[in-house]
UniProtKB/Swiss-Prot annotation:
InterPro entries noted in UniProt: Deoxyribonuclease-1_AS, DNase_I, DNASE_I_2, Endo/exonu/phosph_ase_sf, Endo/exonuclease/phosphatase
Signal peptide stretch: 1-22
Alphabetical list of PANTHER family matching this protein: DEOXYRIBONUCLEASE, DEOXYRIBONUCLEASE-1
EC top class, as a word: hydrolase
Organism of provenance: Canis lupus familiaris (Dog)
Tissue: Highest expression in pancreas.
Name of the featured protein: Deoxyribonuclease-1
GO molecular function: actin binding; deoxyribonuclease I activity
Length: 284
């Protein structure tokens, strides 16, 4: 137990030191994030502690139709500084009555939002749309890092459609390129890109994987889950030479908050069944 606590303390210290020197981004699928979770003092405490590590974070599985939980989250993040975090949130997304939002949290003293838009993947009532939850895309200006502008494309893929949705991210990438004349793009989130949802034989049919323009920063061998499974569901993919050069070597990884904070397995899973995946960009 002492060894686990020491490792957790070292991870936390390393995170603080690295965060002071660069820009840290993450994608975090917080299972069923809504009013119930934010009303639980213990769970909300750790969610805020985790998200406070990041300068830019994309939260997935936001189940908050009236943005009440999002408001509570921002109030807590900003309790010591009312401008510590700002946010951009998508409309509720989904083909049925079940809807989720993408939530972008960012520190305005580190980055600013230049533009945003909702990707149009087709007609949902017609049954010819591509994504269960089509990406909402944000373009950031980052004056403190080597790369000054980049876009973030999130995806929470439907598990049974993971192969098709990950492949279709290539089309989203092209759309962002064309719309903003921008090469430096981060695609990240819970792609469900592992275990039974993407077989080894299927990777060759996924353009986002086979095209050498893309660097996959989270390897297939990673475990991004807090449960007993060992699956690399959550990924970070970067495109654009400036952005790829700006990535701090070996900074991309899942953040195991169970180890870092010395939590029980039960509490860790109550926070979420996923760990955040994170990456750090070099300062200019």
């Amino acid at each position: 137990m002492r060894g686990a606590r020491l490792m957790g303390a070292l991870l936390a210290l390393a995170g603080l030191l690295q965060g002071a020197l660069a820009l840290r981004m993450a994608a975090f699928n917080i299972r069923t994030f809504g009013e119930t979770k934010m009303s639980n003092a213990t769970l909300s405490k750790y969610i805020v502690q985790i998200l406070s590590r990041y300068d830019v974070a994309v939260v997935q599985e936001v189940r908050d139709s009236h943005l009440t939980a999002v408001g509570k989250l921002l109030d807590t993040l900003n309790q010591d500084d009312p401008n510590a975090y700002h946010y951009v949130v998508s409309e509720p997304l989904g083909r049925s009555s079940y809807k989720e939002r993408y939530l972008f949290l960012f520190r305005p003293d580190r980055v600013s939002v230049l533009d945003s838009y909702q990707y149009d993947d087709g007609c949902e009532p017609c049954g010819n749309d591509t994504f269960s939850r089509e990406p909402a895309i944000v373009r950031f200006h980052s004056p403190l890092t080597e790369v000054k502008e980049f876009a973030v494309v999130p995806l929470h893929a439907a598990p049974l459609d993971a192969v098709a949705e990950i492949d279709a991210l290539y089309d989203v990438y092209l759309d962002v390129q064309h719309k903003w004349d921008l090469e430096d793009i981060v695609l990240m989130g819970d792609f469900n890109a592992g275990c039974s949802y993407v077989a080894a034989s299927q990777w060759s049919s996924i353009r986002l994987r086979t095209n050498p323009a893309f660097q996959w920063l989270i390897p297939d061998t990673a475990d991004t889950t807090s449960t007993s499974t060992h699956c690399a569901y959550d990924r970070i993919v970067v495109a654009g030479s400036q952005l790829q050069h700006a990535v701090v070597p070996e900074s991309a990884a899942p953040f195991n908050f169970q180890v870092a904070y010395g939590l029980s397995s039960q509490l860790a899973q109550a926070i979420s069944d996923h760990y955040p995946v994170e990456v750090t960009l070099k300062r200019a």
